[in-house]
Amino acid sequence: MGTHRDVRFVSSGVKLPCADAAPAPAPAPTLLSAALPFARIGRAIDGVVRHVARSLPRLPVARAETGAGAAAAPIALPRRQKDGGGGGGGEERVLISEVAVRGKDGEPLERPELEAAAAAALRACRPNAALTVREVQEDVHRVVESGLFRSCMPVAVDTRDGIRLVFEVEPNQDFHGLVCEGANMLPSKFLEDAFHDRHGKIINIRHLDQVIKSVNGWYQERGLTGLVSYAEILSGGILRLQVSEAEVNNINIRFLDRRTGEPTVGKTQPETILRHLTTKKGQAYNRAQVKRDVETILTMGIMEDVTIIPQPVGDSNKVDLVMNLVERPSGGFSAGGGISSGITNGPLSGLIGSFAYSHRNVFGRNKKLNLSLERGQIDSIFRLNYTDPWIDGDNKRTSRTIMVQNSRTPGTLIHGGDHPDHGPITIGRVTAGIEYSRPFRPKWSGTLGLIFQHAGARDDKGNPIIRDFYNSQLTASGNAYDDTLLAKLESVYTDSGDRSSTMFVFNIEQGLPILPEWLSFNRVTARLRQGYEIGPARLLLSASGGHVEGNFSPHEAFAIGGTNSVRGYEEGAVGSGRSYAVGSGEVSCRMFGPLEGVVFGDYGSDLSSGPKVPGDPAGARGKPGSGYGYGVGIRVDSPLGPLRLEYAFNDKQARRFHFGVGYRN
């Protein structure tokens, strides 16, 4: 509960109580039917206007007091000539010898500054001026519209020196507190700041009107449906504001047919949709929040179209939200292709064909099942993934992925290319694991996993081998296969999805030697990418690095060089080590349509750690350990991501084309 002097904020709004003040709240009007505050002031002014119209032009008899209204009975005046000018439009004018401002009892005001403020508001009414009823009416309006007075009564008094026009004003009360009801979303500090210097001063209707506009603007800027629906001054100088906020009454889900648009029975469980919404029953209706909820449902990948329509509930300030959903087909088969990360010589050896089956809404609960097979001349990958994007009963949006994979990939990244007397080496891996991921800050997410891997090298006939042509060992244990149980911890930061944003990935893997023959090592990697907009161009800087400590398989060393590393070199041709560092910079510019031109430069090094890899595969093959490349390229946007074609030179003046799909790692 926030406090400020004698300001006290309560749960349903704000309250600045006055000592011994007991306001009698009036029923609040509805959100849409409420008028601006102090409508009674307008009615009072109209009454004054009618009184002035009756009094000034006629022949009165005497002056009398009539209580709080302080109405004046005019005295006799001589007949006046009609105004022949354009200003009065034919109205009779009365010559005024003196103009004064007094309190409603006819006595001078206690505060001279109030008398000066009322006098300053007068425009037409000046001493020795011939006035019409219209001009007096306009000055009455000006005095009241100054915001300091609750009433203003013009009184004409016949004196020895002529007609004396007295404006009898009633100032507003001094401000001693504020009661604000219904402001559940409005921060208490907002009104504290608006009234912090007004305590003990005359309530100014102009200032109050500005506060009301700022409150309404606060709701509008944040996409909230809310406004000040009523305002009044209570006894004791207490201001009462009634705020009406649209409240969510119910959220109803309606599935529509993809073809006809008619209501149909959906496959998705309603609770699966509702748990993804940040808008809840009983909350204030927030248009921006509802828009984000629509985007969230679309990112689930199971809906083709989502709309949320608010509908008013009777005469209340509540709304029902109707969510119209069009479901996508739940699953199906697909086929495609790609390029191996371990491209070898030959026109077709780097190409991969793929076949997959996916079901994106298992059990109608947004669970994902993917079964894929990739096959190339050398590569072969069978993968089974089952993902629960949001575990039931968890309120932190934790996801779970279960994975099983059997793969055979080229060993050329670490163990070089073919030799006349020795065929290509492939690395076979059988992997199974489970991972849990969740966001833990607005732009941060984390992953914790446990993965088991059974991996080893094979010759061109598929037979297990433990040494290559250079007599370098291919496994860390000396057996045909290395077994590893990895505990994985990963943290990812990204501030947006575009390429001109910041991304940081930090990963730790620890081998757990539960059995004596299982490998024990620690691997740490990090990647950083930062983009900048420079006029029509875009600068992208990236860096990555890592280190392995312990007993690990040679084929798990860091490979440097290639399309996603140092361009201008073949895959893994710069080196392979226990440690590595790679930096890259590129400037891209849109040429026309989806075509983009790129200029780039890369540098990578194994930080002199190549000989520390078991068997020293980089030293046996004469890899330099460091190198750089530069070149130009073009990119074309496609449904699969950017298609990259690049032509690069390395520091050995060798030239090489690189082709890739998607953004560089």
UniProtKB/Swiss-Prot annotation:
Subcellular location field: Plastid, Chloroplast outer membrane
Q: Which organism is it from?
A: Oryza sativa subsp. indica (Rice)
Q: Name one GO biological process term.
A: embryo development ending in seed dormancy
Please classify the protein's predominant subcellular localization into one broad category: plastid
Q: Which GO terms describe its cellular component?
A: chloroplast outer membrane
Per UniProt, the keywords (alphabetical) are: Chloroplast, Membrane, Plastid, Plastid outer membrane
Q: Which part of the chain is the POTRA domain?
A: 246-328
Q: What is this protein called?
A: Outer envelope protein 80, chloroplastic
Q: What else is known?
A: Probably not processed upon targeting to chloroplasts.
Q: What is a single Pfam family found in this protein's UniProt entry? A: POTRA
The domain of life for this entry's organism is Eukaryota
Family as reported in the entry's similarity comment: Belongs to the OEP80 (TC 1.B.33.2) family.
